[in-house]
Amino acid sequence: MLMSTRKKIWFWCLGVLLVSAVSIFFMFSRISRQRQYFLAVIPHFMIDPVKVQDFYSFLKGRFFPSHEMPDQIVLLSPNHFFLKQKRVEGLCTSGRIRFKDQTIVATPFVDDRIACNGGVFYEKGGQIYTKDHGLGEHFRWINQFFPTVKTVYLLALPTHHMEHASWLAENIQKLPWKTLVIASVDFSHYLSEVIAEQHDQVSFSVLQQSGAFDQLRGLDVDCPACLGVVYRLASKEKIRVHQRWRDSSSTIVGKDLMDQNTSRQFLWRE
């Protein structure tokens, strides 16, 4: 009788341990799959595409080591060609989007505040196109470094309409699992290298500060609103900004191009 009671106690203890182990396993599984977002600012000015490629490689290794991939990518660009558009513009339907000789499969980012018929994307002969280089110049790098990502959102923002940053950041924050957010942004335009470098130092300094959202609109960049989305996301998690490189068309060719100069910063947050 005593042995039978001991066996019952032993089996009960074993059952408790097994249940606890399973609970702990699922708890850690949920933790490892909780919502995460990874933030980067990458130029679309391709005077030196090798450096852009190197930065994508750097981000892949830093954010997604081994064979990991993000579950989705959100690519934010200034709306270069439809400057009167006050709404964020995205896709109407899923499909393969073409820019020059590059294509990418993309998905609509569903929100009533997003327009999809403003001209950033257009259909011709059954093919959806974009001519906006802020989006299209990144297609080849996304395909190269994140080839198995099935969900890519393409959004063109009215450059200085900062009111979109908060709600976009909130929506992105709700996306499941791992999200890579790329703000496609070029920095100083049409200035001598000395002035451009000064402006870029100011921009980086502002991005480093907390509570500086209202200052973003005045920065010498082509999409303050894109930076605003990343800034809002970073502020929620207190994620710091880091600079990988800063260059310009002047530093690349080795002479001051003056009013033909465009500068770039390669930034990430963690």
Question: What do these predicted ranges mean?
Answer:
Residues 1-8:
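Short, Lys/Arg-rich N-terminal segment immediately upstream of the first membrane anchor
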Residues 71-74, 180-182:
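Conserved beta-strand elements of the Class I
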Residues 10-71, 80-177, 191-270:
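Flexible, D/E/H-enriched segments
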Residues 180-191:
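Short acidic/histidine-rich active-site segments
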